Amino acid sequence: FHALAGATVIANLSASDETVGKAEYRRALVSNQSARLLCGYLYASAGHGESTQDMVFAGHDLIAENGTILSENAPFDGGCAETEIDCQRMEAERARNTSFELSGEGYQTVEFDLEPAETTLTRWIDPAPFVPGDPKRRAERCELILKMQADGLAKRLEHAHAKTAVIGISGGLDSCLALLVAVRAMKQLGRPARD
């Protein structure tokens, strides 16, 4: 509900009792929620001081972003989890995801002012998150992109009964990519590249 109203960070203050295996379950739950809602997800469980004769609380804290656990404290250690969440990334992911549609209808928003605090970032943010650092994975990713584009163009050329593909060449990288895709599409259709 909060994510559909536009929240990019959701805090879950929980009183989840501790049992054997519960920490692993909690990690999976928090990771899945953050992925499903395309958000930063803060999970803070009741701590040791809340334990009773019937229930034991471990104070397990977790922070996840879009399916990845970024930070957590160990259950029973009394510490805190802290990190940064890339809210702009979450907004971009939502804009790209066609099955995620914002709807704030019936949602009550409480306005407040908050002065930004001076802080030092502790998390490395990849400046090129969609370009794998590993050369083999990068080559595989590029090949997949070319295949996807060529397949889409081939389908369009077939559907339009086009005899040729016309490309405006400026000498830039975009027109170079367009030419590579067009050649692959023609090859896929069993037609000469000159078409």
Model segments located where?
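CN hydrolase (nitrilase-like) catalytic-core segments centered on the catalytic cysteine
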Residues: 1-81
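Glycine-rich loops and low-complexity Gly/Arg-rich segments
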Residues: 34-38, 66-69, 87-89, 95-97, ...
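ATP-dependent adenylation/nucleotidyltransferase module used to activate substrates
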Residues: 114, 137-195
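Short acidic (Asp/Glu) and glycine-rich catalytic loops that position anionic groups and cofactors
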Residues: 10-13, 126-131, 161-162, 195
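Short acidic, gly/pro-rich beta-turn/loop elements at beta-sheet edges
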Residues: 21, 93, 177
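Flexible inter-domain linker/hinge segments
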Residues: 80-157
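Short hydrophobic/aromatic-rich motifs at helix boundaries and adjacent loops
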Residues: 2-4, 121-126, 187
